[in-house]
């Protein structure tokens, strides 16, 4: 299995993504943002960071990069695309996922571990998690507040497109770290092949880091190929 990790200027989670994919047994290769051909890959990973310095809006300039036309074709063919943090922002700016990621309600960059509940486990990314499991995953963003108009929110909820939702790790009342509507932490496309999420599963794949809750996310992709 071979995945492309797109490198945008300013991205800084590409090595984390490579480590996580390879730990799951997936061959990972870096692809520069000027690339226009993604043939031969089984999946595409858009990593976190600050592409183009987050100028204009987070992900706005990266969404216009040459590689995104190839990513769009890739997604239209039903192949897997994952965007984490800045990658999620890029997917919404490119129109590959609905909604937008706005500035955190507290107007601060937030970096900590949060509770993330698995809402669906019928996708390659989540099939190794029990539905309803609350994961402990890191976040690190200043613009992670998911927003969509009421009609879009109703469609996301009605069609089961919310995959991850912020949830309490213990009994904390302020478990939503950024003010995301409906506590949304991650969504998927109607085809189920394009996933965007703000928490970082790739930063929670090794005991050395004190947390492996993110590893099944990547192992599930391998299981999908084996089916």
UniProtKB/Swiss-Prot annotation:
Which key words tag this protein in UniProt? ATP-binding, Cytoplasm, Glutamine amidotransferase, Hydrolase, Ligase, Nucleotide-binding, Purine biosynthesis
GO-annotated molecular function = ATP binding; glutaminase activity; phosphoribosylformylglycinamidine synthase activity
Coiled-coil residue spans: none
- What SUPFAM superfamilies does its record include? Class I glutamine amidotransferase-like
InterPro entries the record matches: Class_I_gatase-like, PRibForGlyAmidine_synth_PurQ
Which is an annotated Pfam family here? GATase_5
Cystine pairs annotated here are none
Subcellular location per UniProt equals: Cytoplasm
Q: Where is the active site?
A: 85 (nucleophile), 200, 202
SMART domains xrefs: GATase_5
Domain spans labelled Glutamine amidotransferase type-1: 2-227
Q: In which pathway does it act?
A: Purine metabolism; IMP biosynthesis via de novo pathway; 5-amino-1-(5-phospho-D-ribosyl)imidazole from N(2)-formyl-N(1)-(5-phospho-D-ribosyl)glycinamide: step 1/2
**What GO terms in the biological process aspect are recorded for it?**
'de novo' IMP biosynthetic process
Q: Which GO terms describe its cellular component?
A: cytoplasm
Q: What is its main location?
A: cytoplasm
Catalytic activity of the protein: N(2)-formyl-N(1)-(5-phospho-beta-D-ribosyl)glycinamide + L-glutamine + ATP + H2O = 2-formamido-N(1)-(5-O-phospho-beta-D-ribosyl)acetamidine + L-glutamate + ADP + phosphate + H(+); L-glutamine + H2O = L-glutamate + NH4(+)
Enzyme Commission number, as recorded:
6.3.5.3, 3.5.1.2
Q: Which PROSITE patterns match?
A: GATASE_TYPE_1
UniProt keyword annotation of Disulfide bond present: no
Q: How does it assemble?
A: Part of the FGAM synthase complex composed of 1 PurL, 1 PurQ and 2 PurS subunits.
PANTHER family the UniProt entry points to: PHOSPHORIBOSYLFORMYLGLYCINAMIDINE SYNTHASE SUBUNIT PURQ
List the HAMAP family hit by this protein, alphabetically.
Answer: PurQ
* Function comment: Part of the phosphoribosylformylglycinamidine synthase complex involved in the purines biosynthetic pathway. Catalyzes the ATP-dependent conversion of formylglycinamide ribonucleotide (FGAR) and glutamine to yield formylglycinamidine ribonucleotide (FGAM) and glutamate. The FGAM synthase complex is composed of three subunits. PurQ produces an ammonia molecule by converting glutamine to glutamate. PurL transfers the ammonia molecule to FGAR to form FGAM in an ATP-dependent manner.
Q: Spell out the protein name for this chain.
A: Phosphoribosylformylglycinamidine synthase subunit PurQ
Per the record, the gene is: purQ
